[in-house]
């Protein structure tokens, strides 16, 4: 078979994900065109804030409590 149907959650949304070539599992082609949704500036700002706080708040906590993690 030159194209194998990849069973995943996209089938529930009536999309089929197909391998483009045998032996190239990283390259997939979708059966529908890509969506053209443009993010608003507010959505972009919220996404950036969430992204950076997800990584910087735990790092700041660890760095501020470093003497306790070392074992004094």
Swiss-Prot record:
The chain crosses the membrane at residues 41-64. Keywords: Membrane, Mitochondrion, Mitochondrion inner membrane, Transit peptide, Transmembrane, Transmembrane helix. Residues 30-40 are mitochondrial matrix. Component of the cytochrome c oxidase (complex IV, CIV), a multisubunit enzyme composed of 14 subunits. The complex is composed of a catalytic core of 3 subunits MT-CO1, MT-CO2 and MT-CO3, encoded in the mitochondrial DNA, and 11 supernumerary subunits COX4I, COX5A, COX5B, COX6A, COX6B, COX6C, COX7A, COX7B, COX7C, COX8 and NDUFA4, which are encoded in the nuclear genome. Its main location: mitochondrion. One of its GO terms (biological process) is mitochondrial electron transport, cytochrome c to oxygen. Belongs to the cytochrome c oxidase VIII family. The lineage of its organism: Eukaryota, Metazoa, Chordata, Craniata, Vertebrata. Pfam families: COX8. It is found in: Mitochondrion inner membrane. SUPFAM superfamilies: Mitochondrial cytochrome c oxidase subunit VIIIb (aka IX). It comes from the Eukaryota. This is Cytochrome c oxidase subunit 8C, mitochondrial.
């Amino acid at each position: 078979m030159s194209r194998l149907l990849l069973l995943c959650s996209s089938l529930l949304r009536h999309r089929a994900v197909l391998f483009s070539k045998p032996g190239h599992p990283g390259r997939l082609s979708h059966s529908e065109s890509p969506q053209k949704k443009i993010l608003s500036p507010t959505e972009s700002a919220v996404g950036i804030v969430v992204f950076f706080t997800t990584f910087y708040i735990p790092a700041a906590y660890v760095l501020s409590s470093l003497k306790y993690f070392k074992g004094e």
